[in-house]
Amino acid sequence: MRKIAIILLSCLMAVTSMMAGNNAGYGPVKDEQAFRKELMTRTSAVTSIQAKFIQEKYLSVFSRIVKSEGRFYWQKPNSICLDYQTPAKYRITIAGDRIKTVSNGKANVISAKGNPMMDQMSSLIAACMTGNLSAMGSGFKTLVMESKSDFLITIMPQNQTVRNYIFKMEIYLDKRDYSVNRLVMYENETDYTGYVFSEKKFNETIPSAVFDVR
């Protein structure tokens, strides 16, 4: 189970931060109920997302940042693909309960079927990448703050097994369209992986081959 969990978590950490969250300028959201209602409305209207991403990973043991870039794809209801292009080719695809990784031209497919922890982690990843908190399920504590330009959602797993892999996550949503601008995942209090998304496209057709997990 641990091996599968590590592979699934690599959807967020595969090759290698955006700088660790600096919450200066953020305060409690004025009306959290209204925010959640609007977020639900916005995310429910999205059927697919394509974006460019820059990932930066920091591990305190190495005291350095490793940077990578690629393309992100998401399609309703539960298909995700991270296609890393630099500095090394790497691809991870999650579709339903199947996970496929391609590294150095070699593909590996595993099944997470019937594993509750895998379901929970997969839901968490989908929620964080898309901003759809309703996809997250139970077992997570959330804190919502805002600045002039964006919303900040901090997610803290309450399940200790999940916390062994994810200490907390921060999602930065653009106030203009409620899309994810930045995502920071903390493995612990010092090590983290961050993503910045750009060139976002919504509700455009994505070739089925992108999510092929055969």
PLM region spans:
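Boundary at the C-terminal end of the N-terminal hydrophobic targeting segment
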Residues: M18-G21
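Positively charged n-region of N-terminal signal peptides that target proteins for export
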Residues: M1-I4
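Flexible, processing/modification-adjacent segments and terminal tails
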Residues: N23-P28, M40-A45, K52, K57-Y58, ...
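Structural recognition of beta-strand segments within beta-rich domains
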Residues: F62-V66, R71-K76, I80-T86, R91-I94, ...
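Bacterial N-terminal signal peptides
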Residues: I7-T16
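N-terminal secretory signal peptides
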Residues: E32-Y58, R71-Y73, C81, K89-R91
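Gly/Pro-enriched, hydrophobic low-complexity segments
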Residues: I110, L133-R214
